[in-house]
UniProtKB/Swiss-Prot annotation:
Keywords: ATP-binding, DNA replication, DNA-binding, Metal-binding, Nucleotide-binding, Primosome, Zinc
Subunit organization: Component of the replication restart primosome.
Cofactor note: Binds 2 zinc ions per subunit.
Cofactor: Zn(2+)
Family membership noted in the UniProt record: Belongs to the helicase family. PriA subfamily.
Binding-site list for Zn(2+) 1: 368, 371, 408, 411
MF GO annotations: 3'-5' DNA helicase activity; ATP binding; DNA binding; hydrolase activity; zinc ion binding
InterPro entries according to UniProt: P-loop_NTPase, PriA, PriA_3primeBD, PriA_3primeBD_sf, PriA_helicase
GO CC annotation: plasma membrane; primosome complex
Function (record text): Initiates the restart of stalled replication forks, which reloads the replicative helicase on sites other than the origin of replication. Recognizes and binds to abandoned replication forks and remodels them to uncover a helicase loading site. Promotes assembly of the primosome at these replication forks.
Name listed for the protein in its UniProt record: Probable replication restart protein PriA
Record lineage: Bacteria, Bacillati, Actinomycetota, Actinomycetes, Mycobacteriales
GO BP terms: DNA recombination; DNA replication; DNA replication initiation; DNA replication, synthesis of primer; double-strand break repair
Binding site for Zn(2+) 2: 377, 380, 396, 399
Amino acid sequence: MLSVPHLDRDFDYLVPAEHSDDAQPGVRVRVRFHGRLVDGFVLERRSDSDHHGKLGWLDRVVSPEPVLTTEIRRLVDAVAARYAGTRQDVLRLAVPARHARVEREITTAPGRPVVAPVDPSGWAAYGRGRQFLAALADSRAARAVWQALPGELWADRFAEAAAQTVRAGRTVLAIVPDQRDLDTLWQAATALVDEHSVVALSAGLGPEARYRRWLAALRGSARLVIGTRSAVFAPLSELGLVMVWADADDSLAEPRAPYPHAREVAMLRAHQARCAALIGGYARTAEAHALVRSGWAHDVVAPRPEVRARSPRVVALDDSGYDDARDPAARTARLPSIALRAARSALQSGAPVLVQVPRRGYIPSLACGRCRAIARCRSCTGPLSLQGAGSPGAVCRWCGRVDPTLRCVRCGSDVVRAVVVGARRTAEELGRAFPGTAVITSAGDTLVPQLDAGPALVVATPGAEPRAPGGYGAALLLDSWALLGRQDLRAAEDALWRWMTAAALVRPRGAGGVVTVVAESSIPTVQSLIRWDPVGHAEAELAARTEVGLPPSVHIAALDGPAGTVTALLEAARLPDPDRLQADLLGPVDLPPGVRRPAGIPADAPVIRMLLRVCREQGLELAASLRRGIGVLSARQTRQTRSLVRVQIDPLHIG
């Protein structure tokens, strides 16, 4: 495997007789390339070669284990083509590092897994729910986008779909955003499927444990693989179902080249394997809805009466019944009276209250108190934050430097104000507002998975909300402007997903559950939350993006790097070329906020972003042109001068 793009192709080698039996397709080998030994995989064995020069000899077979199966090789090729990457980069994600001792362990022959009977009543609440389970039992390639009801035990539904597929003799792959979701799904899955037939793959595993579980999938002893984003490449044969939960979560986007999204890889794999697919969530992304609109997948959505019965009552500022004369601070206060009243009512009934804040920490962002300029680090221009009430100074969130004497670089003032209030500061404020009430914080490294019964105030960041026995009595969604006000393509979609994930933990309206969102009720995203209509929101979002030419209605390639290198790549790729590829060239623009600079570029070198936009039908052609251009640049540059452009196809954050 060669890391330079212009050498991303197959090479022919002669196989010595002593290695002939072991050198089978898919095994790891060592070969000599330009005088040095490099790792590689055997792709196929042939009796002839198209190479007209002298062939070298294979040096040795590292292991006779065929780790690169035909199915995974096809997937690797397709992902590299889709995301304008190299196969070496994709293989790094797909095949873990070898652990020799684990390979030598004897694996018992896989038997028929024990699967408990599946109760279809959970899926019966949804239109086409029973039909989807029946299709899995018949090993049909049913594809669905499932809208989970509020309060739904999503892991139980996923486990039922997996068990139905395993019972039919097929394997299942389930992808979740993080370890917390993985643990939840593991408990639900092992309640229905024999634990010895289920493996979990995640980044937190050590190399030995990860390779052992990966081999269990390769050798056929694992029939159900659940894992985080990289598990989407798990080497399962006879694949019958691919599932993805909460595809709106940024954790499913791979931060390493070629930056594939687990949802896209999973759907690509389902297409190649001609198997069933399921995307589930409390909210819905425009990408998932596009699959429904195209006819590739079916809607699995509960009828409106069922949604109203299961959802909490959602109120916004204009729904409080207070006019501006009675509550002048309702539109400006961080905790208006409507939110405080909902919290007090729930606490008095003995129920816990969930308070969702967008950011962890104490005060994660500061600004000048006079001119409102954002306070930034003098060393790296990163955002400054306060770590606590007694903090000796502001700390940079990027480089960690401490600035003990804050002074605005624009107006010279030494007065600062909080731009965003974090979870710990919010917990302090609530402790003063509700004396004698337990305040629990779940954010960052301090995660609380489950609450005990009884009243409590729980301050949590999105994704860190603990489950409460019987559900929360109320939820307060604070600082809505921090989510909705972002200059980002997915700001509204992301806000609704975070809100619905929290609101789904609240009791139904019939049991007194109420959700208070501190935002104007006239905002379309807030209206979607009030009506609990994620499908309608996704429909509107998709229509709006289609109208202005944004993903998923089109494909966009983001090229990040120094201006000269970006221009050189465009010239090498011959883009744009009206005669060959109808591509719109947009930019240059600055990198979006929060997007890190490409690796290897000096800190003082300016970085730009150029965007290339094509219709969906020309996405593969755009990626192929960029791959050719990257290869040309790679061949021209030396190791000392190499500064390739970072290329991302359909990045989450466009700018």
